[in-house]
Amino acid sequence: MTSQPERLLFTGGSGLLGRAVRRLRPDALFPSSSEFDVTDYSQMAAWVRGRAIDTVLHAAAFTSPPKIDEDPLRALDVNVLGTVNVVRLCKTLNARLVYVSTDYVFRGDRGHYREDDEVLPVNKYAWSKLGGECAVRLLDNALILRTSFGPDEFPYPKAFADQWTSRQAVSVTAGAILRAVDSGLTGVLHVGGPRRTVLDYARALSPALKVEALSVQDVSFSVPADTSLDTTRYRREIGD
């Protein structure tokens, strides 16, 4: 049996996922990054003082692989040390932590990855998110969600024809994540849709856009070839 947290705090509320979660769970707490900066533990601790919080859904992150290649220290501050701060806060509050990670933690050489498969990132963005996972694993009452999502309308004129993914529209992912939050599960959980190329995903999402093909060889940053996810545990524990 599942139930909603008494009080849910969401980090990264101004982002794509945050806006989608807010529409589904408007009674949760969505502090802005200016008042709840994950790189500033003292500020976070002051903000939660006097508030009853039993679950933190941590999605605040620096998520652009090419920009992280240019500025890896910012990724260290936000994605690794910021997550360490959130872990510390949850320990102090005795709150459950649900951490939004990425399918990119996998090497991408075969796809259909299970939760217990070996992780080996191919770019700095994914290494920084894996660093966050390592911090979260120090908590007993925590859940790591590996997923991939994008806007409800595909935003680009081209998409990778040679990269395989389990990506879903953010509105779908937000609902799936909240069901995972409400489940009370701990450990690692994969959240995603069917295995398909990013191009097939884009064309299914936005057929009127006539998205054209792009190759991973055409971009300057490293892209894993197949990070599709096995979601058997999600379907078994939570449902479709």
Pin down the residues of each PLM region.
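Mid/C-terminal beta-alpha module of Rossmann-like enzyme folds, strongest
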Residues: 176-226, 230
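Conserved Rossmann-fold NAD(P)-dependent oxidoreductase catalytic core, especially the SDR/UDP-sugar
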Residues: 84-120
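Active-site Tyr-X1-5-Lys
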Residues: 120-148
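N-terminal Rossmann NAD(P)H-binding glycine-rich loop of SDR-like oxidoreductase domains
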Residues: 2-25
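Adenosine-cofactor binding site in Rossmann-like domains, unifying the SAM/SAH pocket
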Residues: 26-47
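Glycine-rich NAD(P)-binding loop of the Rossmann-fold in SDR/ketoreductase-type enzymes
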Residues: 39, 70, 74-85, 119, ...
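Alpha-helical substrate-binding/gating segment
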Residues: 141, 147-154, 164-191, 196
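NAD(P)H-binding glycine-rich loop region in Rossmannoid oxidoreductase-like domains
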Residues: 41-78, 89-91
